[in-house]
Amino acid sequence: MKYQLTALEARVIGCLLEKQVTTPEQYPLSVNGVVTACNQKTNREPVMNLSESEVQEQLDNLVKRHYLRTVSGFGNRVTKYEQRFCNSEFGDLKLSAAEVALITTLLLRGAQTPGELRSRAARMYEFSDMAELESTLEQLANREDGPFVVRLAREPGKRESRYMHLFSGEVEDQPAVTDMSNAVDGDLQARVEALEIEVAELKQRLDSLLAHLGD
């Protein structure tokens, strides 16, 4: 497969895809914006603490690989970045809004069940029902230019199998060690996390508005 993203590259691209949809008024993102998005505590697994220099290195690499492009001029005081990973004018990878939402959520959080994906991707795309979501996953798994996702073996204590993206190469399908977290209902946990994400984004928008009013 031609896509071989490192964990940090996947995080950066996932953040840009997410913010392009959820906070379009703040997109494209500056380096500081990408750092904040990468280190966000909601809707991220694992939570990272990347420095500006670490993020800048990833941005430079992704620009060289034509997955991102810089935006400057026309009133922009700082260089900003936008994704060319998918749905760009000259790019080969074309994804529907539903596919973008699922791929983004998998890039940001790793392997997840369909129920978890539906709750966590809701800020980007509202699936009408589980059948639509599962159909979208199957399309991503069977695309001629893919596959882009794979279904993993069901973990102990879980009712659903998880799915994982394939933009970082093949996935080792090894069940995780059973622990107390397996007793937590995945759907309920995902709903709580989705609410936390919404609150965090509303706070971010409010802070941005207050900053503009203070200028």
Swiss-Prot record:
SUPFAM superfamilies: Winged helix' DNA-binding domain (SSF46785). Keywords: Acetylation. It holds the Pfam family DUF480. InterPro entries: DUF480 (IPR007432), WH-like_DNA-bd_sf (IPR036388), WH_DNA-bd_sf (IPR036390). The modification N6-acetyllysine is found at K80. Belongs to the UPF0502 family. HAMAP family: UPF0502 (MF_01584). This is UPF0502 protein YceH. The lineage of its organism: Bacteria, Pseudomonadati, Pseudomonadota, Gammaproteobacteria, Enterobacterales.
